[in-house]
């Protein structure tokens, strides 16, 4: 079948710009819609009770019949964590490499996804043909194996999404970046490049993964006690380095965390991690071995490194606690928005008696290319237009300046925000009208049922507590039958504040008595009067503003 000429290309970021995480890019080629990555983001500190955040996907749901496929660049949560929610609304094939799809299957199983899914495995030489485009792939190097970039070939030129990448001359696990294929795509003509901006502010080159192995091995060699190493569960390269270093230093390995255990088992089964069975012991058996002969790898329930460490430092972990003399290696960088938690965790570990090795030593290197690598990608692909993605705005802006240094014109670089549309029609390009965008907050099984008002209420409850006022009125005569009864949680300790509670009770009684003297009292008006009076009274007495909930019952 002859491939028709492309008339219109639209590129939209529903996530992954102005932020780190929840990558979701929409490539529209004529009437066909393709999705590149569908990730999640870990909540910021003020998002109380929220488990994860995903992009608003209403734009895709409203055009479900036009969505042809989802393409995944690699298996990190920031890129596959939102696929479950997309597949609940869309019936489309999902393309990814062997490891990426294996991790996705585990995640779908974890979320209880029971709908039929069409997962199609690809490799770097795969080519998939649609009506108006051919989709091909190229190998990239990142902190997880089986990473690829995606190229959509159209008659206007190729649309290339790099995914997360760096150029590493001494990579872990013998991974290689297909520079030849990237150059080949560049020589065939690239219309637009969506390129990783996460390290655009960092000059030079990102250090090689090989630099980490020595530091981790030194930590295991120098410590006479247990060594606990915290990683992201999905950082398979780092896990392999820890296993190799532990074996070299004669240490048994215990793996703490179900998510981490699951990823490790999967990666070993598929051949991405090599380790002998006799290296591993259970967490329960750690105490049976001399401390000098044990290494513990840990990650949190969401795969993040800090949650489990915090519990260990607070003596709240079910199986392991930090002991005096332990060495803790944090082989990761803070999740954006959780830098304060990172700092507090390091402090907690130090208080618990641990020697903490983290950012000051090279126990972690980034999986993202720095400025010289971003220039190399631009020079290999020679795009007509550049769209910096996967970064906060300042990173996108730094990427733009780097591109100008390579000779690109500022007018050919688009610093887009979420919901922006870059539209190519023939030889013309413009920024089109915004599409719906935003965050969907996930709390347990609830998807999108938590908004700013709920988060505000949670903040109020966490700061000043709650005060509930209960009164009972005669249904006919409208006078007070019982109460007011005041119940507080997280506001004041009642036994030490009896005088305050008595005064508040009398204040409510006087408001109710005055209001019920009129025959046509409105409950909403009465509740608001109680709320206003108590707010003013309690703030004058305590300088606090608890959430006040009046309850009126009739008998």
Swiss-Prot record:
Q: Which GO terms describe its biological process?
A: mRNA processing; rRNA processing
Record-annotated residues binding substrate? 364-368
Gene3D superfamilies named among the record's database cross-references: 3.10.20.580, Metallo-hydrolase/oxidoreductase (3.40.50.10710), Ribonuclease Z/Hydroxyacylglutathione hydrolase-like (3.60.15.10)
GO cellular component, as recorded:
cytoplasm
Coarse class of the protein's main subcellular location: cytoplasm
Cofactor(s) required, per the database record: Zn(2+)
Highest taxon, organism lineage: Bacteria
The note on cofactor binding and number reads: Binds 1 zinc ion per subunit. The inability to bind a second zinc ion may explain its very poor exonuclease activity.
- Alphabetic keyword roster: Cytoplasm, Endonuclease, Exonuclease, Hydrolase, Metal-binding, Nuclease, RNA-binding, rRNA processing, Zinc
Which InterPro entries does the UniProt record give?
A: Metallo-B-lactamas, RibonucZ/Hydroxyglut_hydro, RMMBL, RNase_J, RNase_J_2, RNase_J_b_CASP, RNase_J_bac, RNase_J_C
GO MF terms here are: 5'-3' RNA exonuclease activity; RNA binding; RNA endonuclease activity; zinc ion binding
Spell out the NCBIfam families in the cross-references.
Answer: MG423
- Other facts: Present in about 3000 monomers per cell in mid-log phase.
Q: What is this protein called?
A: Ribonuclease J2
């Amino acid at each position: 079948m002859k491939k028709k000429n492309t008339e219109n290309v639209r590129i939209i970021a529903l996530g992954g710009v102005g932020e780190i995480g929840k990558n979701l890019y929409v490539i529209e080629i004529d009437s066909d819609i393709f999705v590149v990555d569908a990730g999640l983001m870990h909540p910021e500190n003020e998002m109380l009770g929220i488990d994860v955040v995903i992009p608003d996907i209403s734009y895709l749901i409203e055009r479900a019949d036009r969505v042809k496929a989802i393409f995944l660049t690699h298996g990190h949560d920031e890129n596959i964590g939102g696929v479950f929610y997309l597949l609940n609304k869309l019936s489309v094939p999902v393309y990814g490499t062997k490891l990426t799809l294996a991790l996705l299957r585990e995640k779908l199983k974890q979320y209880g996804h029971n709908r039929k899914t069409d997962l199609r495995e690809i490799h770097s030489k795969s080519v998939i043909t649609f009506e108006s485009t051919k989709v091909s792939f190229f190998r990239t190097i990142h902190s997880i194996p089986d990473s690829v970039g995606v190229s959509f070939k159209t008659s206007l030129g190729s649309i290339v999404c790099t995914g997360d990448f760096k150029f590493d001359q001494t990579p872990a696990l013998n991974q290689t970046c297909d520079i030849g294929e990237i150059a080949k795509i560049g020589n065939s003509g690239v219309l637009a490049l969506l390129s990783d901006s996460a390290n655009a502010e960092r000059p030079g080159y990102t250090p090689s993964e090989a630099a980490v192995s020595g530091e981790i091995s030194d930590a295991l060699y120098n410590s006479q006690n247990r060594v606990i190493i915290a990683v992201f569960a999905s950082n398979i390269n780092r896990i392999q380095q820890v296993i190799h270093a532990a074996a070299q230093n004669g240490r048994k390995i215990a793996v703490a965390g179900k998510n981490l255990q699951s990823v490790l088992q999967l990666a070993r089964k598929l051949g991405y991690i090599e380790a002998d069975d006799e290296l591993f012991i259970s967490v329960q058996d750690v105490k049976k071995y001399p401390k000098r002969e044990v290494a513990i790898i840990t990650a949190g329930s969401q795969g993040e490194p800090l949650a489990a460490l915090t519990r260990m430092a607070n003596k709240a972990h079910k199986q392991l606690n930090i002991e005096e003399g332990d060495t803790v290696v944090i082989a990761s960088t803070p999740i954006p928005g959780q830098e304060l938690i990172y700092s507090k965790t390091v402090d907690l570990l130090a208080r618990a008696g641990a020697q903490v090795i983290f950012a000051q030593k090279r126990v972690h290197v980034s999986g993202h290319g720095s400025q010289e690598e971003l220039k190399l990608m631009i020079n290999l692909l020679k795009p007509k237009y550049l769209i910096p993605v996967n970064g906060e705005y300042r990173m996108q802006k730094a990427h733009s300046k780097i591109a100008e240094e390579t000779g690109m014109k500022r007018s050919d670089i688009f610093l887009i925000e979420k919901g922006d549309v870059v539209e190519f029609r023939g030889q013309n390009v413009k920024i089109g009208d915004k599409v719906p965008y935003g965050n969907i907050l996930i709390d347990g099984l609830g998807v999108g049922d938590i908004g700013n008002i709920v988060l505000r209420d949670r903040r109020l409850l966490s700061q000043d507590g709650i005060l509930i006022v209960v009164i009972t009125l005669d249904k006919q005569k409208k006078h007070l039958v019982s109460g007011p009864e005041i119940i507080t949680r997280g506001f004041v300790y009642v036994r030490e504040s009896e005088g305050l509670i008595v005064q508040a009770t009398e204040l409510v009684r006087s408001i109710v008595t005055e209001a019920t003297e009129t025959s046509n009292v409105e409950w909403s008006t009465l509740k608001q009067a109680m709320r206003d009076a108590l707010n003013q009274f309690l703030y004058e007495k305590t300088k606090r503003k608890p959430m006040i909930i009046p309850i009126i019952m009739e008998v």
